[in-house]
């Protein structure tokens, strides 16, 4: 379900997702933001457990020259979910997606900022459970002052993060890759 309000050149669209609907509103919003990004795409999510389609979209955005950056927590709340999240880093990092871990604490923010012009913020994580199994609410913003606030927030977050892109862009040992493949079998369940 989506509702919108327009004030001057500002737009705010509220969307809600639920597991009973065949429409995957949050996933579609994220995929559209990724597809239309031209310069920058900044994402924060506590859990990065994405579909092949989402992974492909992020990798293609980076390949076409978009500065794609993803912030995940460096301090986990769930160790298995943390390990699964990290299993996605290599595939993304090798294609130019920059990965950051927030180390001062647990970052639970769920936001996506596209070219500093349009943003989504709300309760939807970049994971299977949020996108397919939970009731979620998000807001899509365009032309609002809040977008500038989000951009400044990202600047602060990046300064507090450790970039781990290089560590994961070179690949990993066979045992770690096998372990990550096993963990990914359970990704839709966590």
Kindly give the residue locations of the regions a language model identified:
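Single conserved hydrophobic/aromatic residue that forms the stacking wall/gate
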Residues: 1-13
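Structural alpha-helical scaffold elements that stabilize or flank donor/cofactor-binding regions
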Residues: 5, 33-36
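PLD/PLD-like phosphodiesterase catalytic module centered on the HKD motif
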Residues: 10, 37-42, 47-190
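Glycine-rich phosphate-binding "P-loop"
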Residues: 14-22
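Conserved catalytic alpha/beta core of Sir2/sirtuin-type deacylases, generalized to analogous enzyme cores
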Residues: 22-25, 32
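A generic local structural motif
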Residues: 27-30, 126
